[in-house]
Amino acid sequence: QMCIRDRNYGCVIKNILVPTKKGPVDVVVGHDTLADYENDFNSQSSTCCGAFVGRYANRIENAVFSVGGRAYHLEANNGKNHLHGTFPRKIYEVKSFGDTLLLEAESPDGEDGFPGNLKISVRYILTEDNALRMDYRVSSDADTVLNLTNHTYFNLDGEGDVLNQKLKLYASRYLEGNNETCP
């Protein structure tokens, strides 16, 4: 049976222990201590390693966007652009354990410069066939932009480099970025 370990700081997936013939292997690349995660997430060159990322995963060009004809100005934290937001630095309340881990938090109107009060619910669900499902639910009391992701990094061997590992994505479309990797 697969096992997942999480931190309520940043909703981080810290470990995924996968059963193998040689025993469990941790396939997650992460940090050892909470202080390491805090240092990473507060750094200008943060990897957001293992974290739940938002309010807007990816970059917002020139740190400005419009909703309903109104311009919203964000912190330029990645050159002249805005990257990811502060969800990785939030403390999430753990609501349930077991095969389903439920974590919740709120994001007040104006946090990071975004409109709307958000209620955030993140579920990490471990299925009977050793699959991990991530279910995000967010409600807002105002029109806003939202783009969520999880920033877990994997090494399927559990250690060493990943240069011989292959990833295949079955996607009919993808979003290209400009020279600053902004959509």
Label for each model-derived stretch:
Residues 159-183:
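Active-site/ligand-binding surface loops and adjacent short beta/alpha elements
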Residues 6, 124, 132-140:
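Short, well-ordered beta-strand segments enriched in hydrophobic/aromatic residues
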Residues 108, 136-143, 169-175:
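Short, solvent-exposed aromatic-acidic interface loops
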Residues 11, 115-119, 126-133, 145-147, ...:
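Coil-to-beta-strand transition motifs
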